[in-house]
């Protein structure tokens, strides 16, 4: 074994050495580790690791083998049994190593050598691997740093570019601003110089004026001295003349004496005693003369007395009717005027007219021709209570009328005098008067019912308290007038057949003499029982409730007729209704505060609970609290808090009072005794807690207490059981005075109320504060309970201790249904509280408009007399819808509306101070409202009002007069002016009483200026949103100076003129319904009315007129419908009147040219109109204006060719020879007084007609430049303003969208037609002027558009397309083939479909479903374009090389293979896109993105021109054009084209020399025609002319050099700079469009 092991071991150990050593040496020789890559190093590492693992295995195997060999070698030959062998072993082991020889060829040495070598190799490899890994890490770090640096470099470069761009932009802006500032500085300097020059001139003028004043002063002093001298001379002369007169008089007396002596001597000689009669006769005549004078002076005195007494309503003729009226008045019941009364009447005569004038100023004119109709319930208002004008006040007269019946017996034949104007006396007597007489009587009765009686009869009624301190000045006169008119009107009254009056007790003592009134059913049919505590539902309108009687005076006891109960099915007794005493202490009221006392508020107990399973706390509170207008106050034992709820703005103070209730436990209280008070009727307290339940059911005490519990709880079963018991007092009241009926009514338990009423409970039982069950139900809003209580004759006018009636409480809490029921029952609206408040005060104090309207209008007739409405009503009815209040008269008198409380505040004061504008509006509708009534602090309602209420009060009696602009009468068929309107309403003038004539003039001027600027603005802006300058003219040139005259109604007026009356009085007196402004027209030699009628700017019309006057020969040409004929005729009219004003006779001659109009006819026209005169004849003084219309129907060169020279030079130096009918020829010439105007309905001239162009002055009316460009927009805007009566609607209004759509259709149609190369189909704005403007009916506009499309647009487009597609275009020829081919028909249908969908239906304001319904009405609405696509692809083979070379746009390629269909037009955002030529011809911005599409289409057009010149098929061109319109995806929305008009770009192609121009802001410059046609000499001339006329501001054409992205913004800024438009530049664009496209995307 040793031999085997020895022989094998060297071989085994050599193999790993060779395996490990050979690769190491090879690696040294073949490659270097430093040059290896990362992947190679990794592979080498993996190989080495495999080698190491293999060597480890070998080492382990060798170690095991070594152990075996060692043991074999050392111990193999010994035996343990042999000791000597053991000794030998130990010996050998103990010997030194050097001495020992290897037993065999020692494999350990070999193994150790191998291991040492491997260890060395492993260490070297590990060092090399570590070095390689470190180098790799370093390389990775360097790569990352390099990438970061590159990114940072890119960012910095981009930032640098941005900063450069920004800096350039800033520099450009700064340069621009510097230029602007320098320009402004120059302007300011120039202005300063002008101002300084003006100042110097003013100084010179001032000094000159001072010198003149000094001279005038000297002259005046001299003249004064001269006057003094002359006066002294006159005095001297006068004294001399007086002395002479005295001498003459003395001489005359001497002569008279001598004459008398001579007469006496003669008479003595003739007769003896005849001298005495002759002496007495002069004395008698003298006496008679004196008597006549005294009669003349006494007569008017007598008449004036009678007039003041009896004839106030007939002030126009006071002297004629005196003798008749004085004796008749006493017979009618008026007391005769005694001597003392006469004196009083005469003394008060001076106050009559002021009183009448004051009434007129408030709308209460006495001398009204058509009296207003009062409502029938006017009688019912007053008869329930006393009239304040004739009976004592409720609160101020404790002892009024101690006996009422006895005085009445003495006056049974006639009513007492004071009752003639008292509603209490007259209302029951004549309840069904003629409405006109009733209205007139109502005016006199209601205007001031507080006036004391002045008829001298003081036994009928004591003097009343005067509520109005400001109405004492005219009491006497108004009282006399009221008596007189009321007496006269009472003759015409008679009792009516229907509707008997409600029984009442007037003060005259006619008690119980009225017929009974039937009462209908009071239960609401089908009315469900309302849960306790919940607000009852609103019932249907009652068929009619009875009118229960009420005492007119609190002291009277009225005995009702028992026949009332017999006519009804409801239990009623003949009771004596006693009202509460009226002598109550007057309470103090602070403004906006209420002093609440215990005596002025009833106590309403909460509902007790008997159900043990229901938690009682707040069982009825939440619903009640939320259903009321005001909130009931929270209660404390000793403090009563006032109402302060969400809906009430009252902030009253609180007043502590002694409480009679001790809030201990529920068992210690009596049921029904509550601390819930009806505090000034303000509402229910949300924090009420039922007193009978504090954690458990209330103990059932005595039967009366249990009865109240059941009534408050609404337990009908228990209540009915208790009522069936005998001996139970159902009227028992607790210590607060609350009965069971009170508790049931307060909590709204209708069934309980009915049970108690059927059990004969006292319906008017009041608590200790005087509140009845009706008061509680009305305050809580339980209208069914109110209805029941009224049916059982509850006192509807019962006043509590504080004076609160059920109506007052219902109004205070805004319970409409309760108010309606009470008013229908005839409650008194005029009862005042202790503080002097009426129900109207209560309704206004809470801001409840519905309650106020019910109080004022309920019971009024449905429709009043519209002709006789008060002036205040007319204002509000202008702005409000038709409603009951607006068409009927209020039923409350003016005294009640103007009644002031203890502080002097009226309802208007309260509404104005709290900002309740709606309530104030309702009050202002009452004609008798006195807004100037002052309170005790001398403040009016306006003084205490909020801002919006102040505005309302200022406009109270304002008149709204429409202001209209008139342009005079427009002749029918006036040359395209059929759609023009004569008058337009621009606004409504608000004329107040205090408006002066200066303010009126300024308002008219400002309204005109605002209107002119509004209709000429760009957007839909309201007049309030725009800040106008009243001195600047509008963009159309009109201003206030354009006005010719103004008429106020039918009265002429000029700005600045003043009348004696104020504008308000003047408008009312003259019944002026409108103010009409007439603009200056051609009759005055002005064109303002023409500007307003046609919306052509005034400056342009004046420029046209100047051209006519300067050049004498002007032709207006443009597309059909451009108003050429109208412009020419109006200019001729203006020129005619100017010449006539200068003293020259003038005549206008019109001639319509047709195809048969020959040159001979034109010669005859010129000769007959004396425009062409023989050379031998001298020109006449007469001016001749000739208008040749429709020149497009004839050849200009043939018609006017022989007249070109003579027309250009109006003198004998340019004669022309014409043959007459007899064969003789004669020379003629055009004289200087001849003007020639022509009209051509054609967009451009062609062929031989261009020869005529240079001999005339041409005015081109282009559709895409002014005046035609903005004419339609201004015209339709004015139409909308007129339709909305002067108001500009908001831009989102459907009418504005419809008008904008019609405007966009016109522009888009012309853009598409221009792109298709069919200028003869272009349309002027005339056809679109008739666009209907109907608010809310956009369908009408779409129908009108369909008719216009079918009748005008589609036939013109069809003719133009066939004209282009049939033959090669020749100038002047527009012929069409009679039988178009199928391809031509397809092209026409495709063109119509594309135009319809891209230009007409695009942007339609209708919804998609509605639009689809109307699409069928349009001719050519649905046509599939697959034919176009196939046709286009087939014709692709015939394209020339140049076409394929240039037409490389990707949008052309993508469009060639698309086949969209237009059966249902796609109007979505990604559907239809506008085409580029639209953008070319319609107002685009010159951005680089648009430059691309411009170049594409320019290349298209240029190559189209090349193909035409090569004789290619025009159908293919049209198909290409149409398809590019369909498939253009890169263009902006077509609806945005019409938004800007500053940058118009057009392209012109004339022959082989195309001109690319962009006209910027040049509305008047004619440009070359947009037409693709072969080159001709005439077109070359035209092109050169147009090229010279275009502005220098053409777009800069883009270079063919590549453009980086960062310069796009810079290029867009430079596009407005001028550059040349040479041919080479154009070719560069076309050839390099492909290079530009990548930079555009």
UniProtKB/Swiss-Prot annotation:
Q: Name one GO cellular component term.
A: FAR/SIN/STRIPAK complex
Gene, per the UniProt record: CTTNBP2
| Top-level taxon of the source organism | Eukaryota
Protein name as annotated: Cortactin-binding protein 2
Q: For bias kind Polar residues, which ranges apply?
A: 385-405, 576-586, 1551-1562, 1570-1579
Extract the Gene3D superfamilies matched here: Ankyrin repeat-containing domain (1.25.40.20)
Which InterPro entries does its entry note?
Ankyrin_rpt, Ankyrin_rpt-contain_sf, Cortactin-Actin_Reg, Cortactin-binding_p2_N
Say where the protein is mainly found: cytoplasm
Tell me the subunit arrangement: Interacts with CTTN/cortactin SH3 domain. Interacts with STRN, STRN4/zinedin and MOB4/phocein; this interactions mediate the association with the STRIPAK core complex and may regulate dendritic spine distribution of the STRIPAK complex in hippocampal neurons. Activation of glutamate receptors weakens the interaction with STRN and STRN4.
Query: Coiled coil: which residue ranges?
Result: 119-276
What is the stated purpose of this protein? Regulates the dendritic spine distribution of CTTN/cortactin in hippocampal neurons, and thus controls dendritic spinogenesis and dendritic spine maintenance. Associates with the striatin-interacting phosphatase and kinase (STRIPAK) core complex to regulate dendritic spine distribution of the STRIPAK complex in hippocampal neurons.
Compositional bias per record (Pro residues), positions renumbered to this chain = 497-506
Query: Where are the Phosphoserine modifications?
Result: 1512
Residue stretches of each ANK repeat: 702-732, 736-765, 769-798, 802-831, 835-864, 903-933
Instruction: Show the Pfam families listed in the entry.
Output: AAA_lid_NAV1 (PF25408), Ank (PF00023), Ank_2 (PF12796), CortBP2 (PF09727)
Location in or out of the cell: Cytoplasm, Cell cortex; Cell projection, Dendritic spine
PANTHER family registered for this protein in UniProt: CTTNBP2 N-TERMINAL-LIKE PROTEIN, FILAMIN/GPBP-INTERACTING PROTEIN
Question: Annotated region Disordered: where?
Answer: 1-27, 361-433, 446-472, 488-588, 1442-1468, 1544-1641
Low complexity composition bias: residue spans: 1612-1626
Residues with Asymmetric dimethylarginine modification: 491
Bias-annotated ranges (Basic and acidic residues): 1580-1590
Which UniProt keywords are given for this protein, alphabetically ordered?
ANK repeat, Cell projection, Coiled coil, Cytoplasm, Methylation, Phosphoprotein, Repeat, Synapse
Give the Gene Ontology MF terms in alphabetical order.
Answer: protein phosphatase 2A binding
């Amino acid at each position: 074994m040793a031999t085997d092991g020895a022989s094998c071991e060297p071989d085994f150990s050599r193999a790993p050495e060779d395996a490990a050593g050979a690769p190491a040496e090879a690696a040294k020789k073949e490659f270097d580790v430093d040059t290896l890559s990362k992947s190679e190093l990794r592979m080498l590492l993996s190989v080495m690791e495999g080698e190491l693992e293999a060597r480890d295995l070998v080492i382990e195997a060798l170690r095991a083998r070594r152990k075996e060999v060692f043991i074999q070698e050392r111990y193999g030959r010994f035996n343990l049994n042999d000791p000597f062998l053991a000794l030998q072993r130990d010996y050998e082991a103990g010997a030194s190593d050097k001495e020992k020889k290897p037993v065999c060829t020692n494999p350990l040495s070999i193994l150790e050598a191998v291991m040492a070598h491997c260890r060395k190799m492993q260490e070297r490899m590990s060092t090399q691997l570590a070095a390689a890994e470190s180098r790799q890490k370093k390389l990775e770090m360097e790569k990352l740093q390099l990438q970061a640096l590159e990114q940072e470099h890119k960012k910095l470069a981009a930032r640098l570019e941005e900063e450069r761009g920004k800096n350039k932009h800033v520099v450009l802006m700064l340069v621009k601003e510097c230029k602007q500032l320098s320009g402004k500085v120059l302007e300011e300097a120039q202005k300063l110089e002008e101002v300084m020059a003006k100042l110097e001139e003013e100084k010179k003028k001032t000094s000159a004026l001072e010198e003149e004043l000094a001279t005038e002063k000297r002259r005046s002093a001299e003249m004064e001295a001269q006057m003094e001298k002359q006066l002294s001379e006159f005095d001297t002369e006068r004294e001399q003349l007086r002395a002479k007169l005295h001498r003459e008089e003395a001489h005359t007396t001497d002569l008279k004496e001598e004459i008398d002596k001579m007469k006496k001597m003669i008479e003595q000689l003739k007769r003896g005693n005849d001298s005495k009669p002759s002496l007495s006769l002069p004395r008698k005549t003298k006496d008679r003369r004196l008597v006549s004078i005294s009669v003349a002076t006494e007569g008017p005195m007598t008449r004036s007395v009678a007039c003041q007494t009896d004839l106030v309503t007939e002030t126009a003729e006071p002297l004629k009717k005196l003798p008749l009226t004085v004796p008749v008045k006493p017979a009618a019941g008026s007391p005769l005027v005694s001597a003392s009364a006469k004196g009083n009447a005469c003394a008060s005569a001076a106050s009559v007219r002021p009183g009448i004038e004051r009434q007129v100023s408030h709308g209460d004119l006495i001398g009204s021709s058509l009296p207003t109709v009062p409502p029938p319930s006017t009688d019912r208002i007053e008869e329930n209570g006393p009239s304040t004008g004739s009976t004592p006040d409720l609160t101020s007269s404790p002892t009024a009328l101690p006996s009422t019946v006895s005085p009445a017996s003495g006056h049974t034949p006639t009513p007492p005098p004071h009752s003639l104007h008292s509603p209490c006396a007259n209302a029951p007597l004549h309840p069904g008067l003629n409405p006109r007489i009733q209205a007139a009587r109502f005016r006199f009765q209601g205007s001031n019912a507080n006036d004391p009686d002045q008829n001298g009869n003081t036994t009928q009624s004591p003097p009343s308290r005067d509520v109005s301190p400001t109405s004492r000045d005219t009491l006497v006169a108004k009282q006399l007038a009221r008596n007189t008119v009321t007496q006269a009107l009472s003759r015409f009254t008679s009792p009516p057949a229907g509707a008997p009056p409600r029984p009442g007790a007037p003060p005259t003592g006619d008690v119980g003499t009225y017929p009974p009134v039937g009462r209908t059913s009071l239960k609401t049919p089908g009315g469900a029982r309302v849960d306790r505590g919940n607000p009852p539902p609103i019932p249907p309108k009652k068929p009619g409730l009875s009118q229960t009687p009420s005492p007119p005076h609190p002291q009277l006891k009225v005995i009702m007729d028992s026949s009332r109960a017999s006519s009804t099915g409801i239990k009623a007794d003949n009771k004596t209704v006693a009202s509460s005493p009226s002598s109550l202490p007057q309470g103090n009221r602070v403004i906006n505060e209420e002093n609440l006392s215990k005596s002025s508020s009833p106590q309403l107990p909460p509902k007790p609970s008997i159900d043990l399973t229901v938690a009682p706390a707040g069982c009825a509170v939440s619903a009640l609290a939320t259903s009321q207008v005001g909130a009931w106050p929270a209660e404390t034992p000793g403090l009563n808090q006032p109402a302060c709820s969400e809906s009430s703005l009252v902030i009253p103070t609180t007043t502590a009072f002694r409480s009679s209730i001790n809030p201990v436990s529920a068992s210690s209280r009596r049921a029904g005794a509550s601390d819930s008070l009806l505090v000034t009727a303000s509402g229910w307290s949300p924090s009420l807690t039922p007193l009978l339940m504090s954690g458990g059911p209330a103990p059932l005490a005595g039967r009366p207490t249990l009865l109240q519990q059941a009534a408050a709880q609404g337990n009908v079963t228990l209540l009915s059981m208790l009522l069936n018991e005998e001996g139970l007092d159902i009227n028992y009241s607790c210590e607060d005075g609350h009965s069971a009926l009170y508790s049931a009514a307060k909590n709204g338990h209708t069934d309980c109320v009915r049970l108690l009423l059927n059990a004969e409970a006292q319906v008017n039982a009041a608590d200790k504060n005087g509140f009845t069950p009706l008061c509680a139900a009305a305050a809580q809003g339980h209208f069914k309970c109110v209805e029941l209580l009224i049916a059982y004759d509850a006192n509807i006018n019962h006043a509590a201790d504080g004076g609160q009636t059920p109506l007052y409480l219902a109004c205070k809490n805004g319970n409409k249904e309760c108010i309606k029921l009470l008013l229908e029952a005839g409650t008194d609206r005029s009862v005042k509280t202790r503080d002097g408040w009426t129900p109207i005060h209560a309704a206004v104090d809470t801001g409840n408009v519905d309650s106020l309207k019910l109080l004022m209008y309920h019971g009024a007739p449905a429709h009043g007399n519209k002709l006789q409405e008060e002036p205040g009503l007319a204002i509000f009815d202008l702005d409000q819808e038709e409603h009951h209040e607006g068409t009927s008269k209020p039923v409350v008198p003016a005294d009640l509306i103007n009644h002031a409380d203890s502080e002097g505040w009226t309802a208007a004061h309260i509404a104005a101070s709290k900002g309740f504008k709606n309530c104030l509006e309702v009050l202002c509708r009452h004609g008798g409202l006195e807004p100037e009534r002052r309170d005790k602090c001398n403040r009016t309602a306006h003084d205490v009002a909020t801002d919006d209420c102040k505005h309302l009060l200022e406009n109270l009696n304002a008149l709204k007069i429409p202001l209209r602009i008139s342009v005079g009468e427009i002749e029918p068929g006036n040359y395209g002016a059929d759609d023009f309107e004569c008058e337009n309403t621009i606004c409504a003038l608000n004329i107040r009483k205090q408006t002066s004539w200066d303010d009126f003039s300024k308002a008219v001027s400002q309204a005109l200026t605002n209107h002119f600027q509004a209709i000429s603005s760009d957007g839909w802006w309201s007049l309030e949103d725009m800040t106008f300058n009243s001195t600047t003219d509008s963009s159309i040139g009109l201003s206030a100076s354009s006005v010719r005259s103004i008429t106020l109604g039918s009265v002429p007026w000029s700005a600045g003129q003043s009348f004696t009356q104020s504008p308000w009085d003047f408008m009312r007196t003259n019944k002026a319904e409108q103010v009409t402004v007439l603009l200056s027209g051609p009759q005055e030699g002005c064109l303002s009315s023409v500007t307003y009628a046609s919306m052509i700017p005034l400056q342009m019309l004046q420029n046209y007129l100047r051209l006519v006057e300067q050049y004498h020969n002007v032709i207006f040409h443009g597309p059909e419908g451009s108003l050429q004929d109208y412009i020419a005729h109006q200019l001729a009219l203006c020129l005619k009147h100017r010449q006539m004003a200068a003293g020259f006779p003038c005549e206008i001659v019109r001639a319509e040219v047709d195809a048969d109009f020959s040159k001979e006819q034109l010669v005859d026209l010129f000769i007959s109109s004396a425009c062409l005169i023989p050379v031998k004849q001298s020109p006449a003084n007469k001016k001749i204006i000739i208008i040749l219309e429709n020149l497009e129907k004839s050849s200009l060169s043939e018609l006017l060719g022989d007249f070109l020279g003579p027309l250009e030079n109006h003198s004998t130096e340019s004669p022309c020879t014409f043959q007459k009918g007899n064969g003789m020829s004669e020379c003629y010439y055009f004289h200087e007084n001849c003007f020639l105007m022509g009209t051509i309905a054609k967009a451009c001239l062609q062929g031989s007609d261009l020869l005529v162009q240079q001999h005339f002055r041409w005015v081109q009316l282009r559709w895409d430049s002014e005046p035609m460009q903005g004419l339609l927009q201004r015209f339709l805007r004015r139409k909308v303003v007129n339709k909305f009566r002067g108001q500009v609607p908001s831009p989102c209004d459907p009418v504005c969208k419809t008008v904008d759509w019609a405007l966009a259709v016109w522009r888009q149609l012309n853009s598409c037609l221009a792109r298709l190369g069919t200028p003869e189909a272009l349309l002027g704005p005339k056809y679109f002027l008739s666009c209907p403007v109907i608010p809310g009916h956009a369908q009408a506009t779409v129908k009108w558009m369909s008719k216009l499309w079918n009748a005008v647009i589609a036939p013109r487009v069809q003719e133009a397309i066939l004209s282009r597609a049939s033959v090669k275009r020749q100038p002047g020829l527009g012929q069409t083939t009679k039988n178009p081919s199928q391809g031509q028909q397809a092209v026409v249908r495709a063109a119509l479909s594309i135009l319809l969908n891209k230009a007409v239906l695009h942007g339609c304001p209708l919804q998609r479903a509605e639009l689809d319904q109307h699409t069928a009405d349009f001719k050519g609405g649905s046509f599939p374009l697959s034919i176009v696509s196939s046709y286009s692809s087939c014709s692709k083979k015939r394209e020339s090389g140049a076409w394929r070379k240039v037409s490389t746009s990707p949008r052309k390629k993508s469009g060639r293979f698309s086949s969209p269909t237009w059966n249902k037009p796609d109007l979505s955002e990604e559907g239809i896109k506008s085409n580029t030529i639209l953008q070319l011809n319609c107002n685009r911005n010159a951005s680089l993105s648009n430059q691309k599409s411009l170049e594409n289409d320019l290349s298209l057009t240029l190559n189209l021109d090349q193909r035409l010149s090569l004789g290619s098929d025009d159908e293919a061109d049209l198909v290409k054009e149409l398809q590019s319109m369909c498939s253009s995806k890169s263009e902006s929305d077509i609806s945005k084209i019409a938004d800007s008009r500053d940058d118009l770009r057009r392209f012109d192609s004339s022959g082989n020399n195309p001109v690319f121009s962009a006209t910027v802001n040049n509305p008047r410059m004619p440009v070359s025609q947009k037409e693709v046609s072969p080159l001709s000499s005439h077109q070359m001339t035209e092109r050169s002319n147009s090229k010279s006329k275009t502005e220098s501001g053409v777009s800069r054409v883009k270079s063919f050099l590549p453009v980086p992205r960062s310069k796009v913004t810079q290029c867009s800024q430079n596009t407005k700079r001028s550059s040349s438009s040479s041919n080479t530049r154009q070719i560069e664009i076309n050839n390099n469009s492909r290079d530009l496209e990548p930079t555009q995307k």
